[in-house]
Amino acid sequence: YIPNSLYNFHPGSHTGQGSDVGIDLTSTMISEVFKTVKNASTKLLSETMAGKGSEIGRTFEEVKQIIDLAEQKFGSSLKGRLGVCLDTCHIWDGGYDIVSNLDGVIEEFDKIIGLENLYAIHLNDSMNPLGAHKDRHEKIGKGHIGFETLYKVTRHPKLCNLPFILETPNEQSGYIEEIKMLKK
């Protein structure tokens, strides 16, 4: 346990039982975590997913359902304790067109989930075209999202103060180069 930290998780899969069952199970597990660790200051972040197979959290609406149901089951507000990590590869692969409509996607996120619930961003390019539902991360500027869009994400006034985490297929030296590119 590290006080005041962020703990990111993938919300899981419904394994053929349907999204509602998966969302219910995930929200139950979140509620149990908070019941067990009552006074922890660590924030639990549900990651946005690409929608491969039977993944849940593949739309902003599903992520919101997970949060709302967890709050309902916990019995009190989880505001400030439960939030979201937005993964650029996942939302692109899930069908959110951040290349052509970054502002629109951010507005949609805000309308459905609320930007006050966004605590971190996984910054990745994607090997796949928009809406492929595959979750294949690519190095910054080498995929279908492209450097220009990812740079805009890091400079966007509604996102620029969040922590950005690279999850690109790289060695240490590759991460150093990507960070240098993004800081220019």
What is the predicted role of each segment?
Residues 11-15, 48-52, 88-90, 125-127, ...:
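Active-site-proximal loop/turn and secondary-structure-junction residues that shape catalytic pockets
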Residues 7, 44, 87, 121, ...:
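Conserved, mostly hydrophobic/aromatic
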Residues 165-173:
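Short, flexible active-site recognition loops that position polar ligands and cofactors
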Residues 3, 32, 36-43, 79-83, ...:
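A structural signal for the main folded, soluble domain(s) of proteins
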Residues 172-184:
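C-terminal helical cap(s) of enzyme catalytic domains, especially alpha/beta-barrels
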Residues 1-83:
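Active-site acidic/histidine proton-transfer and metal-coordination neighborhood
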Residues 84, 89-94:
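Short acidic, Gly/Ser-rich segments with clustered Asp/Glu that frequently serve as metal-coordination loops
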Residues 56-60, 64, 92-161, 169:
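Gly/Pro-rich active-site loop or hairpin
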